[in-house]
Amino acid sequence: MKKEEYLEKVALANLWMRAYYEKDEPLASDEEYDALIRELRAFEEQNKDEISKDSPTQKIAPTIQSEFKKIAHLKRMWSMEDVFDESEFRAWAKRAKCEKNFFIEPKFDGASLNLLYENGKLVSGATRGDGEVGEDITLNVFEIENIPKNIAYKERIEIRGEVVILKDDFEKINEKRALLNQSLFANPRNAASGSLRQLDTSITKERNLKFYPWGLGENTLNFTKHSEVMQFIRELGFLKDDFVRLCVNLDEVLKAYDELLALREKKPMMMDGMVVRIDDLALCEELGYTVKFPKFMAAFKFPALEKTTRLIGVNLQVGRSGVITPVAVLEPVNLDGVVVKSATLHNFDEIARLDVKINDFVSVIRSGDVIPKITKVFKERREGLEMEISRPKLCPTCQSELLDEGTLIKCQNIDCEDRLVNSIIHFVSKKCLNIDGLGENIVELLYKHKKITTLESIFHLKFNDFEGLEGFKEKKINNLLNAIEQARECELFRFITALGIEHIGEVAAKKLSLSFGKEWHKQSFEAYANLEGFGEQMALSLCEFTRVNRTRIDEFYKLLNLKIEKLEIKSDGVIFGKTFVITGTLSRSRDEFKALIEKLGGKVSGSVSKKTDYVLFGEEAGSKLIKAKELEIKCIDESAFNELVKE
């Protein structure tokens, strides 16, 4: 890299850093920014006499510019040096001249906060800012419930940590913002930072922020180990994460990194790495600091789950109900070992909200098995080659005219090939008729060869329909035909679910089955609307569907021997009338526990509220368990639940 290119990259890095810190509006993904900083460092290591004083490697953050007052930290708040793989980690340890006794904990992806206590009382809260001076957000800090306002320690002390938003709360915040037609937060970190810097404290309060401590600033304590410091902080009443380790050597640190990385998706809050810190405080003091970092600690970063790429096109998919879903075609990008080439755009209202165009640079996130999605459009990086994404007029599959309802655009042709295929795939899926061996690819193959063309045709398949088809041998054919025969004996609620009626899912299907039996499709609007949990929209959907398909449903009854499960509810037990929430990994499926609770007269809810009576938790329980403890709801493990059931 030449000096001119280096200076250009310094300017670009500063532009990205100011957008991130001052406006909470990133112009690049973390992965892009980290890569740029590493380029600068590589040049600077080889050209120490040409290092620009403006380089982001030489400072913590831009000067603060905001409506909040400034507040000086009593001791500087440092950033951490990033390491990205084993070799970089071992190189850091070698520079620190330490290969034993490390304190490690998760690196939460949130906003850093400095709390000042005097005479046992919280007197101020400030953002990191430039490390020396932050923003005075004291009023907002008082709205964070899990920050103690009084502590059992009278000396002046600065307690530092990370403010985060739990993943579930983040989704709720964005759902609410979407309804209000407000711009969505790109990620929980931006949401946490934005929530701390609200002029209206009531907004901060409703965001349900959490504070996790990670260290001290000013203090007069005499501990010799950082692990003792953290134990002291937690005894003052601060939240502790479950994953904290003392590692005796480098290999143990690497093992802990792998363990924490495996928990990444299951943690209730976002993590972007693991903090590794020398536990011996005397050695930390001896090592000291660089211009920007402490030499005794590092952030061992996880592989990026969010990256920047270019949107190069849009494909249209037709669902079983006829709804057209736009899917972004992306320049391939590797996200945590998976090559991502597409991302959902949900609907055309979402395209308008994002103001995304073909050839835009976009930020794409992938989380677990969730379909990749676009979280941000970098409009400032447009080059004049971008093209609008127009709303379609014709179905991409059958070319029939589409019905544009605003948010949803639908194909109304019931013979549209994509609609039929997706309806069949849904009909045979696990939560519906659960026909083992009849997966998506097999359905598409059978439809292509006209072996199945309707839902009913599944039950007319014969051995010779499969002969000559690729991959089908005698054993496989017989297994599939046996699975189809077994599906004839399914429960009525599964059949209702399988029909794919708009607004009618598994829970509603069970209610219909138990309330009306096989006559469920011959009821009035009033009968549907009066069911517990049903409303006008569901009743209208049922009336319209059954009006059109009543005869067809009766014909299905001739093909199937549907069973109606009678739910015998025990009304004299301790569970009767109680509401449960189930979270974490248990020895049996959630459906099994749900069925047992309902049989004993209880109810199972999907979210924790003040109306919840019990939270049944298993291993790696997440945000629901945290919220339950905050609301002082009774939390029981599987063993306690089994004892409760016996009573």
UniProtKB/Swiss-Prot annotation:
Keyword list, A-Z: DNA damage, DNA repair, DNA replication, Ligase, Magnesium, Manganese, Metal-binding, NAD, Zinc
Protein name: DNA ligase
Species name: Campylobacter jejuni subsp. jejuni serotype O:6 (strain 81116 / NCTC 11828)
GO molecular function, one term: DNA ligase (NAD+) activity
Organismal lineage: Bacteria, Pseudomonadati, Campylobacterota, Epsilonproteobacteria, Campylobacterales
Residue ranges of domain BRCT in the record: 570-647
Family: Belongs to the NAD-dependent DNA ligase family. LigA subfamily.
Keyword Lipid metabolism: no
Function field: DNA ligase that catalyzes the formation of phosphodiester linkages between 5'-phosphoryl and 3'-hydroxyl groups in double-stranded DNA using NAD as a coenzyme and as the energy source for the reaction. It is essential for DNA replication and repair of damaged DNA.
A Pfam family assignment: DNA_ligase_OB
A GO BP entry: DNA repair
Active site, UniProt feature: K107 (n6-amp-lysine intermediate)
